[in-house]
Amino acid sequence: MKILVTGGAGFIGSAVVRHIINNTQDSVINVDKLTYAGNLESLTEIENNERYKFEHADICDSVAIANIFAHHQPDAIMHLAAESHVDRSITGPADFIETNIVGTYILLEEARKYWLALSEDRKGAFRFHHISTDEVYGDLPHPDEVSSDTILPLFTEQTSYSPSSPYSASKASSDHLVRAWRRTYGLPTIVTNCSNNYGPYHFPEKLIPLIILNAIAGKLLPVYGNGEQIRDWLYVEDHARALYEVVTKGVPGETYNIGGHNERKNIDVVKTICRILDELIADKPDGIENFEQLIRYVSDRPGHDLRYAIDASKIKQDLGWVPQETFETGITKTIHWYLNNKEWWQRVMDGSYAGERLGLVE
């Protein structure tokens, strides 16, 4: 099977590419624009594999995408290319509209044209797998808002959309486009919505890598608002396994939620990282006895969702997928990776981002 992966140099995309090349006999065509968050160094372990090809292209370039389809003749598309940071979407929403909505439209149209020209056998086996986020659903009641005997709801595949940020609104729009191309044109599409990912090769604008790297450097650890917001955490390699199961075994027209079964308050995530670093690093930065001393509460993100939590029972029942990592095992692996891969993240931090606060509304 030949799988075209968009955004394969990004955090989740590179995990998908590594999983396919390392654990299957399938081939990958990685199509990536290489924005600030795209990093081919995340793929050095597989870059010379004969089953891996890279195409430097923008999904908004219809001519380039059509040529790539014609040249490589993929059997499936896994669409991960996206602008994905909520804070950046607050200060610069235009890139999110362009890439996440217009780019998805162009990819759908070129995929539809390509698919229509395939033989009947190949047409029947073709898949367009759109990878999205649980943020399209909005937020859920927080345990502090309800009585202790209340059963807290989870996001299911039937949950209505109610996006809160420019990022989540752009992803919701792309989800609707994908489903429209399925219903209107018959394109065999599948949608997945995942919870918060973490793990190796994560660009340090996101909470977990930012906290790890700030702590190592002895910098303050910013926590938005009161830190009580709750997220479900999914180890990225578990997610990559799930996505491969979906593209190879999933049913066209279906949606699958993918979660880690690891609800944690943001402040508890930060304190867990501090505790593990305390155990691993004997020589602390000057002036501190433990890393929790670096925690500082800062102004909250505008429109910050209170709680995300996913019901992943459908993908377990239909495809047999369950996460292998608990939050404790996954976060320990993640911290060890950052401690042992200083060259990777130092080169990232020497580029366009140095850990500054993003997403403030003037």
UniProtKB/Swiss-Prot annotation:
* Enzyme type, top EC level: lyase
Q: Which keywords annotate this record?
A: Carbohydrate metabolism, Lipopolysaccharide biosynthesis, Lyase, NAD
Per its UniProt record, the required cofactor names are: NAD(+)
Q: Which SUPFAM superfamilies match?
A: NAD(P)-binding Rossmann-fold domains
Co-factor note (free text): Binds 1 NAD(+) per subunit.
Q: Which GO terms describe its molecular function?
A: dTDP-glucose 4,6-dehydratase activity
What catalytic activity is recorded?
A: dTDP-alpha-D-glucose = dTDP-4-dehydro-6-deoxy-alpha-D-glucose + H2O
Q: Which GO terms describe its biological process?
A: nucleotide-sugar metabolic process; O antigen biosynthetic process
Q: What is its EC number?
A: 4.2.1.46
Which residues are noted in the entry as substrate-binding? 84, 133, 196, 206-207, 222-224, 231, 266, 300-304
What family does the Swiss-Prot or TrEMBL record give for this protein? Belongs to the NAD(P)-dependent epimerase/dehydratase family. dTDP-glucose dehydratase subfamily.
What is the protein name for this chain?
dTDP-glucose 4,6-dehydratase
